[in-house]
């Protein structure tokens, strides 16, 4: 049974040459970095101010300037923090792949990378899920709880938030693939060298 599972592992990602595997993983990390960084920047700069009529006294409208900012919603703040941390994680892993090949302590490097990748997937998943829930609430409201929708008044704010969500979901999918590849890399045992060197 164990032999069959090892054979299955050797068919996909592991059947690639080690150098090709390294570059595939590196390119996925670069794409994930750009996706999560874009989500962080777009949501972090998301703000819209509008002047709306809030009441009418006689025939005179009373206007007020209202602002929609990502800081007003804790779920969006968590989204920015989660994607920012994922961007930093990916940047550190890219630097480690390029320059840190000799930084391995008793073979723990691959295990730590796999654990950190899984933690990052969980963090981004939580952030994007919370933000998606609040975005849906802002778009459609909730008539049972008497929460009004705001996207009919702050269209640009909602459009930018939607773009940030798309980028973050793309980053999450890439991070899931990276996490699977890290675990496979951890499980694959290097094949023993069959050449014998005689001194």
UniProtKB/Swiss-Prot annotation:
Residues 1-22, 96-112, 185-199 are cytoplasmic. Disulfide bonds: none annotated. Keywords: Cell membrane, Membrane, Transmembrane, Transmembrane helix. PANTHER family: CASP-LIKE PROTEIN 1U1. Belongs to the Casparian strip membrane proteins (CASP) family. It comes from the Eukaryota. The keyword Cytoplasm does not apply. Pfam families: CASP_dom. This is CASP-like protein 1B2. One of its GO terms (cellular component) is plasma membrane. The chain crosses the membrane at residues 23-43, 75-95, 113-133, 164-184. The keyword Cell membrane applies. It comes from Populus trichocarpa (Western balsam poplar). Signal peptide: none annotated. Homodimer and heterodimers. Residues 44-74, 134-163 are extracellular. It is a multi-pass membrane protein. It is found in: Cell membrane.
